[in-house]
Swiss-Prot record:
PROSITE patterns cross-referenced by the UniProt entry: THIOLASE_1 (PS00098), THIOLASE_2 (PS00737), THIOLASE_3 (PS00099)
UniProt name for this protein: 3-ketoacyl-CoA thiolase
Pathway: Lipid metabolism; fatty acid beta-oxidation
Active-site residues (renumbered): 91 (acyl-thioester intermediate), 343 (proton acceptor), 373 (proton acceptor)
Subunit structure as annotated in this protein's UniProt entry: Heterotetramer of two alpha chains (FadB) and two beta chains (FadA).
MF annotations from Gene Ontology: acetyl-CoA C-acyltransferase activity
The gene coding this protein: fadA
Organism: Shigella flexneri
Length: 387
């Protein structure tokens, strides 16, 4: 079976969804920009040699509809002979795109693929057109479709206090801002055109959504966002609303060596699981355990983790049950996470994987794990190994 390697991984800056940098930039353009950039950064691979493009996107309507993967590829002037498909596993879409491409390469059906994902929540809100079947309520609580309430449930079940959530959220912003100031994101962010507050066209090379002024004291003043009477989850301890895209060049190890391209990491194992929709945020726990089992590893073998921060109330129970509470500052989301950077749904799986690869290199660790929860009760995880 072929070894699957990541040759390159990049992303756009994360733009604010409400009146932000990409308010006049379409999702297809963000995607096409990264496709062109990956090919330009790796000229040894001819675009015509790509076997497929897998692109995650959740709200596949309006500008994100009608197979945005193909639309973006055509905009990027990828040869017409290269196919493209849009992948949807809700929050895990672009990580699923990676898994789909990896399996194709493992079986010998492909040698080189572009994978990634995009979400422009500013143009296509996450709830746009959603119409749940009324019959679902026979088997699943209605609140299971309300992500904030599932986070509230996890917080109560695991004893996660408001103070713990506020502290974790403040940490996310502080870590993300420190990473920005130290140029830790420089290797992953591709400068991307947008508009500043005055409408002037400019190149953005930083994440617009980070709030460096965030403090625990300021977060403590916010009202609960989802359960006004008894809740502990606020807007400040939830993932920010942002627009962005991320992309990776995935190849068989043999093809990368043939072309003289240096692999950055191997895909060591992959896992996806289902869980109770009412506690959808717990999905990373069984997904990570399964991925570790497939890799023949334990959590203690992993040097750094990227865990998508849907909510502080959601990620803290996952950290706790993976036995990592004492290692948060050494291993977990060292450059902040979605609370600070935002969670553009179809982009996030590739985004956290891209950040993870850079952290693995900077910290000089052998193994890294990226994982995320998925709405309606799923979890997805990938173990990477440095080459």
């Amino acid at each position: 079976m072929e070894q699957v390697v990541i040759v390159d991984a990049i992303r756009t800056p994360m733009g604010r969804s409400k009146g932000g940098a990409f308010r006049n930039v379409r999702a297809e353009d963000l995607s096409a920009h990264l496709m062109r950039s990956l090919l330009a950064r790796n000229p040894a691979l001819e675009a015509a040699a790509l076997d497929d493009i897998y692109w995650g996107c959740v709200q596949q309507t309006l500008e994100q509809g009608f197979n945005i993967a193909r639309n973006a590829a055509l905009l990027a002037e990828v040869p017409h002979s290269v196919p493209a498909v849009t992948v949807n596993r809700l929050c895990g879409s672009s990580m699923q795109a990676l898994h789909d491409a990896a399996r194709m390469i493992m079986t010998g059906d492909a040698q080189a693929c572009l994978v990634g994902g995009v979400e422009h929540i500013g143009h296509v809100p996450m709830s746009h057109g959603v119409d749940f079947h009324p019959g679902l309520s026979r088997n699943v609580a209605k609140a299971a479709g309300m992500m904030g309430l599932t986070a509230e449930m996890l917080a109560r079940m695991h004893g996660i206090s408001r103070e713990m959530q506020d502290a974790f959220a403040a940490r996310s912003h502080a870590r993300a801002w420190a990473a920005t100031q130290s140029a830790a994101f420089k290797n992953e962010i591709i400068p991307t055109g947008g508009h500043d507050a005055d409408g002037v066209l400019k190149q953005f090379n930083y994440d617009e959504v980070i709030r460096p002024e965030t403090t625990v004291e300021a977060l403590a003043t916010l009202r609960p966002a989802f359960d006004p009477v008894n809740g502990t989850v606020t807007a400040g301890t939830s993932s920010a609303l942002s627009d962005g895209a991320a992309a990776m060049l995935v190849m068989s190890e043999s093809r990368a060596h043939e072309l003289g391209l240096k692999p950055r990491a191997r895909v060591r194992s992959m896992a996806v699981v289902g869980c109770d929709p009412s506690i959808m945020g717990y999905g990373p726990v069984p997904a990570s355990k399964l991925a570790l089992k497939k890799a023949g590893l334990s959590a203690s073998d992993i040097g750094v983790f990227e865990m998508n921060e849907a909510f502080a109330a959601q990620i803290l129970p996952c950290i706790k049950d993976l036995g990592l509470m004492e290692q948060i500052d050494e291993k977990i989301n060292l450059n902040g996470g979605a609370i600070a950077l935002g969670h553009p749904l179809g982009c996030s799986g590739a985004r956290i994987s891209t950040t993870l690869l850079n952290l693995m290199e900077r910290k000089d660790v052998q193994f890294g794990l990226a994982t995320m929860c998925i709405g309606l009760g799923q979890g997805i995880a990938t173990v990477f190994e440095r080459v």
